[in-house]
Every structure is written in structure tokens, then in C-alpha cells.
């Protein structure tokens, strides 16, 4: 089997983990204590779900996951929560002191103490796999554990499991709302350190999700639970093809092959449709054409940026539910004609489609309506460079005054790492710019020399 191991790091990673495993359990008919419910045999017509769950001798299903935080409170909620019996106690790892929003604490001082234990637990999980295909790593860019510890973990996973894929689900600091002043520092340091270790990183921007909750779901004051349930739907759509049989089965490496044209350009933009509340869904016919079209609306995106200003390099449409290839082809043809979608000239075809016949599941009492079909679009577009530019600008404002830098240096970091990381991100912005320029322009330039 092609198993995937999920690693949830820091508060954001663990809380998203809660939402995701709650949803996965519902989708596979697994109850809170890990046993199969009455519907399970109907849903899991084969054993594809074992990519995410392992089965014990007495019929319990245990997530192939590890939750790590350098301070105990968030993971303690899992230990005492509804799904406390789902996880093996050793899968929930906590330290005693937190990283205090400081990358250097997560990566050097505090993180160093936990890393071997975490790798040891991950090793136990990988030993139980017959054909490990890779890791899914959930974390935030802004927190100390999410940024520092994750980048340390990624480095070590690369050492221990060289060729295995590592996909990240990363929470990008929102342009307006911020949970920590030093988010830009942490984000840029972690991006620099993990850039060469991550194969593909799906970024989710808190503010974009706040807006979706307000606009599409009519939630006036969205809580983290609202945000995480929405994020878990996206994670579920991306991983559905690994957990269910479909007409087009995508494994982790297939994502990279289709979405990542150059190793560094591995930040696809995620869009999901339909995001709609139950009251509205009742009055709308969400046809394949409609949901496909709404994927190209900037306000269904998980990161604030405008694809109309950028060019697409690749585009993956992952449909689930009552969808047939004919409808999809018609919908995509319509979009190609009417939308202002610009592909880079060196990548003419552009659309890859996956269809999964398992309809989307919703958490009972959640915000999303139960729909017959949904689509998740992963597109690699040069527009996402806007997100980096925003972050770099904030970094520059603080770093020009060397504000807060002493906290990092005090934890054993060198100031040179800041400028090194910043240069790497400047190079990343440049890479995006170059990828978007047309190839025939470059040919003409070459003749002058």
C-alpha cells in the first residue's frame, strides 16, 4: 500500500489536524474510538483508506499521524477531546516550554530537545508501512514551533528518508490580521530553510479564509474552528484520491510531476468550490460548469493574490462526487474560451483532471452545505509571488531597524541567517518573474552578445 504519514506541528498544525481527522473519520465511517461504524463497509469498498489509517489486531483504526507541539496546552485538548481514543498516546508529543513565536527557539534551543523523540515516533509509524509514499506536514509560517521546529524536522526527514515526498500545508500570515509581530521574520526564515526540502507546499492564508467565511457562509465572526473545518475540506479534497478509488488516481509524486515545473516553484494556489451555506445551497443548482467557473474567481482562493495579473504554469482540477468526464471537458472548454486565463507560452496544455466518485462529506452541525459535487483546483501561477512580495516588504521594514532581532540571536542564531534568508526569497521572487516571461522574448535578447 502507498501510505502517507501526517505530521502536525505547533498550534495551527494540531488544530487543523483535529479538523482533518474528524472529517476523515466521517468520510470513512470510523467512529471516535477508531472502530468501524455501520456504514463503513459501504463506503470503503476497497482498502484505499489504509493509506491514512493503520488497523490494529482488535479492529481499531489508528491515524498514521504524529502531533507535536513544544508546549502542552493544545495537544492536551486532543488528549481530553472527543477523539482521544483514536490516537495512540505516543502519537501526541509535547514539550514543556513553548517556542514563544521565536523561530530560533523552535529550530535551535527548544526544538533540539524534542526532535529525536519525534523522529523516533515517526520511525515507528514508517516501520509499520509496507510502501511509504511520503509525508504531509501541517504547520503555520508565523509561529515559533510551526516555523522553527518544522524546518528542523524537514531537514532531518530529508536525511532519514531521502527520496520520499514531503508535502506541506502551511498557514501563511494574513496581510491584515496578525497573531504575532514577528511573523514576517519566522515566515521568511522557515521558507528559506525548508525550500530545498519541501516538494510541494499548499499555502493557506488566514485572511482569505476569514473572508470566505464571512462572504460565502455568512459567519460574522469566524472562529478558528470555522477556519479549520474549511481547511480540512480542502485537505480532504487534495487527499481524496489517495484514500478512495477514482477514475484518476493521483499519488503524492503525481502532484509534483504535474504542478512543479522547477523545484523551487512549488507553491500551488488552492481554490475550492462550492463554499456555500445550507440556506443558499437549497436554492442553487451547482452544476459542474458553475463550480468550475467559480474556481477562477479570486474570492474562492485560499491565498490573497490576483491570478489575473499572473500566468498559469499548470492547473489541476480535482473533482469529487457526481461528476462525469464529459461535463468536465465542456466546463473547461468554456473557461478556456471566456476567461482571461493566461498560460505561460512554454506550457500550452495546462489542465489535469482527477475525478473521485466519493461525494464531499460535511461535519454535522458545521457551516458547509452538503453538496453532490465539489472541485478543488490546484494551480501553479506566477501571481502567488505577490504573497511573497508582501511578506518580504514587512520583513524589510522591521529588519531595517533590526527590530526584535536580539531575541533570535540570543537563542543561538547568527544575524547572517536573516540576510541569507531574505536574499533567498528575493531570488524566489525573481524566479517567479522569470518563469512568467515569454520564451521568445529571451531568444531575441540572446542575439546581442
Swiss-Prot record:
Primary localization: cytoplasm
Protein name as it appears in the record: Tubulin alpha-8 chain
This protein's domain notes: The MREC motif may be critical for tubulin autoregulation.
Extra remark: This tubulin does not have a C-terminal tyrosine; however, its C-terminal phenylalanine residue can be cleaved.
Active site annotation, chain numbering: 254
InterPro entries referenced in this protein's UniProt entry, alphabetically: Alpha_tubulin, Tub_FtsZ_C, Tubulin, Tubulin/FtsZ-like_C, Tubulin/FtsZ_2-layer-sand-dom, Tubulin/FtsZ_GTPase_sf, Tubulin_C, Tubulin_CS
Keywords from the named record: Cytoplasm, Cytoskeleton, GTP-binding, Hydrolase, Magnesium, Metal-binding, Microtubule, Nucleotide-binding
Organism: Mus musculus (Mouse)
GO terms, molecular function: GTP binding; hydrolase activity; metal ion binding; structural constituent of cytoskeleton
Lineage: Eukaryota, Metazoa, Chordata, Craniata, Vertebrata
Cellular component per GO, a single term: microtubule
Annotated tissue distribution: Expressed at highest levels in the testis, followed by skeletal and heart muscle. Expressed at low levels in the developing brain.
Entry PTM: Some glutamate residues at the C-terminus are polyglycylated, resulting in polyglycine chains on the gamma-carboxyl group. Glycylation is mainly limited to tubulin incorporated into axonemes (cilia and flagella) whereas glutamylation is prevalent in neuronal cells, centrioles, axonemes, and the mitotic spindle. Both modifications can coexist on the same protein on adjacent residues, and lowering polyglycylation levels increases polyglutamylation, and reciprocally. Cilia and flagella glycylation is required for their stability and maintenance. Flagella glycylation controls sperm motility.
Positions contributing to Mg(2+) binding: 71
Role according to the record: Tubulin is the major constituent of microtubules, a cylinder consisting of laterally associated linear protofilaments composed of alpha- and beta-tubulin heterodimers. Microtubules grow by the addition of GTP-tubulin dimers to the microtubule end, where a stabilizing cap forms. Below the cap, tubulin dimers are in GDP-bound state, owing to GTPase activity of alpha-tubulin.
SUPFAM superfamilies membership: Tubulin C-terminal domain-like, Tubulin nucleotide-binding domain-like
Amino acid at each position: 500500500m502507498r501510505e502517507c504519514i501526517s505530521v502536525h506541528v505547533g498550534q495551527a498544525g494540531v488544530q487543523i489536524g483535529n479538523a482533518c481527522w474528524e472529517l476523515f473519520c466521517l468520510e470513512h465511517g470510523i467512529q471516535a474510538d477508531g472502530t468501524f461504524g455501520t456504514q463503513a463497509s459501504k463506503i470503503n469498498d476497497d482498502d484505499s483508506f489504509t493509506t491514512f489509517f493503520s488497523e490494529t489486531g482488535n479492529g481499531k483504526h489508528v491515524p498514521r499521524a504524529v502531533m507535536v507541539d513544544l508546549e502542552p496546552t493544545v495537544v492536551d485538548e486532543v488528549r481530553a477531546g472527543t477523539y482521544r481514543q483514536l490516537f495512540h498516546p505516543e502519537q501526541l508529543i509535547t514539550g514543556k516550554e513553548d517556542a514563544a513565536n521565536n523561530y530560533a527557539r523552535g529550530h535551535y534551543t527548544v526544538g533540539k530537545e524534542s526532535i529525536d523523540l519525534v523522529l523516533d515516533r515517526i520511525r515507528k509509524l514508517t516501520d509499520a508501512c509496507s510502501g511509504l509514499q511520503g509525508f504531509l506536514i501541517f504547520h503555520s509560517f508565523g509561529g515559533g514551533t510551526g516555523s522553527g521546529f518544522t524546518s528542523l524536522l524537514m531537514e532531518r526527514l530529508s536525511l532519514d528518508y531521502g527520496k520520499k515526498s514531503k508535502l506541506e500545508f502551511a498557514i501563511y500570515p494574513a496581510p491584515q490580521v496578525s497573531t504575532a509581530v514577528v511573523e514576517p521574520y519566522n515566515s521568511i526564515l522557515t521558507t528559506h530553510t525548508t525550500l530545498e526540502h519541501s516538494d510541494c507546499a499548499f499555502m493557506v492564508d488566514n485572511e482569505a479564509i476569514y473572508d470566505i467565511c464571512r462572504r460565502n457562509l455568512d459567519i460574522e465572526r469566524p472562529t478558528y474552528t470555522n477556519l479549520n473545518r474549511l481547511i480540512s475540506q480542502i485537505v480532504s479534497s487534495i487527499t481524496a484520491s489517495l484514500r478512495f478509488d477514482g477514475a484518476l488516481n493521483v499519488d503524492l509524486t503525481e502532484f509534483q510531476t504535474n504542478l512543479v515545473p522547477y523545484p523551487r516553484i512549488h507553491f500551488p494556489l488552492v481554490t475550492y468550490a462550492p463554499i456555500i451555506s445550507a440556506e443558499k445551497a437549497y436554492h442553487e443548482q451547482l452544476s459542474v460548469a458553475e463550480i468550475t467557473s467559480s474556481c477562477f474567481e479570486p474570492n474562492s482562493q485560499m491565498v490573497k493574490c490576483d491570478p489575473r495579473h499572473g500566468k498559469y504554469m499548470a492547473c489541476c482540477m480535482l473533482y469529487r462526487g457526481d461528476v462525469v468526464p464529459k461535463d468536465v471537458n465542456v466546463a473547461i472548454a468554456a473557461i478556456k474560451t471566456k476567461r482571461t486565463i493566461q498560460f505561460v507560452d512554454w506550457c500550452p496544455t495546462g489542465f489535469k483532471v482527477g475525478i473521485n466518485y466519493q461525494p464531499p462529506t460535511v461535519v454535522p452541525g458545521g457551516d458547509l452545505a452538503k453538496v453532490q459535487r465539489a472541485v478543488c483546483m490546484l494551480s501553479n501561477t506566477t501571481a502567488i509571488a505577490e504573497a511573497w512580495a508582501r511578506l518580504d516588504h514587512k520583513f524589510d521594514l522591521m529588519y531595517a531597524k533590526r527590530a526584535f532581532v536580539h531575541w533570535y540571536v540570543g537563542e543561538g542564531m547568527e544575524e547572517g541567517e536573516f540576510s541569507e534568508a531574505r536574499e533567498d526569497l528575493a531570488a524566489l521572487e525573481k524566479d517567479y518573474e522569470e518563469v512568467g516571461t515569454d520564451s521568445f522574448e529571451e531568444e531575441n535578447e540572446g542575439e546581442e552578445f
